[in-house]
């Protein structure tokens, strides 16, 4: 049985009464449609990142990303968010990894993609509450910033390290 406690623009909160292996349990669950995140390299092989204000943490450096619209496919969201946040279009989005940032109490899945065939086409198309700027960095510098704790965003860490790991194995 599910009891909806709250429904907002981005997330909801429900309490579930479940039976797991014959035992009655309660689970509080933050419900989120999920997100798409994008690793995109420009024509000079620099990783395109955004410096974005994320309350309550202040400004963070992260890969472009955004929440799925209702019934939107993750790949479509990735194309849309890349263009909105960076002004770049991509010819192709290749799935990299899907992961659950808070699996015990949150339904959110983050779908990470690698964009290719990039072309600068427009200025940023930010949502009214987004405060960000585009920055470009060498991939090795991004790895160094992760190692030094300067990049702390989980989707960025997961996507960058997965990409580096897969490249190293190939």
What are these language model-derived features?
Residues 2, 22, 70, 129-170:
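Nudix hydrolase/Nudix homology domain
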Residues 2-37, 42-43:
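Acidic, metal-coordinating catalytic segment for phosphate/diphosphate chemistry
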Residues 4-6, 99-111, 168:
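Acidic pyrophosphate-coordinating catalytic loop
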Residues 12-14, 18-22, 102-121:
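Active-site-adjacent beta-strand/loop module that shapes the phosphate/pyrophosphate-binding cleft
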Residues 15-17, 40, 114-116, 136-138, ...:
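Short, well-ordered beta-strand micro-motif
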Residues 62-95, 113, 127-130, 138:
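The catalytic Nudix box helix
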Residues 107-145:
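Strongly charged, low-complexity linkers/loops
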